[in-house]
Swiss-Prot record:
Stated name of the protein: Small ribosomal subunit protein uS3c
Ranges of residues in domain KH type-2: 39-109
Keywords: Chloroplast, Plastid, Ribonucleoprotein, Ribosomal protein, RNA-binding, rRNA-binding
Gene3D superfamilies: 3.30.300.20, Ribosomal protein S3, C-terminal domain
Localization per Swiss-Prot or TrEMBL: Plastid, Chloroplast
Alphabetical GO biological process terms: translation
A single cellular component GO annotation: cytosolic small ribosomal subunit
Summary of subunit composition and partner proteins: Part of the 30S ribosomal subunit.
Family under the similarity heading: Belongs to the universal ribosomal protein uS3 family.
GO MF terms held by the record: rRNA binding; structural constituent of ribosome
Organism of origin: Guillardia theta (Cryptophyte)
Amino acid sequence: MGQKVNPLGFRLRITSQHRSSWFATKESYPQLLEQDFKIRSYINRELEAAGISKIEISRNANQLEVSVYTSRPGIIVGRSGLGIEKIKTDILRLLKQDISIRINVIELTNPDADANLIGEFIAQQLEKRVAFRRATRQAIQKAQRANVQGIKVQVSGRLNGAEIARSEWVREGRVPLQTLRANIDYATKEAHTTYGILGIKVWVFNGEQTPTYAVI
């Protein structure tokens, strides 16, 4: 039976980069890793409506820098920047540590081509009881209008309330998962419906690019 590796981890430092960038000793590593998890969980939970694609965290000696990639930056920034200040205050309370925090809000130039936001859109449609084929077709059409070179969407579970769970997928264009220089965006989401949880996987092919580092 074929096993599939995570496309983002498979291409680390080739077409994708680490989303946490810092150095730690063996003793402090677990604590910093837990802090990253708490920060991401908090932002994704509190700013669910902001259309967040990814969160990058970097640290130096006395500063924590959080970069949030979003399709709706206004929701995060808030009026006169009050939203940013609230995030800083909440993160300090969460970490229970006196540290300088910098929040960068980066607007996505092409949100319809982002795998995370595509998966989120499909999950929202399924939770509104839209038929899964219609939801996936709408998402794929939006991605095609955003000029992606290929997209694949898989939905698993009790589709349309069926008694037996199954998986169905749709692909348009090329999605070369075995090509390391292929710029593949990947995301997984869950839709909580009255029939149970549906799993959603999205692969988006944005063309090939020259690796930043040599591939051995």
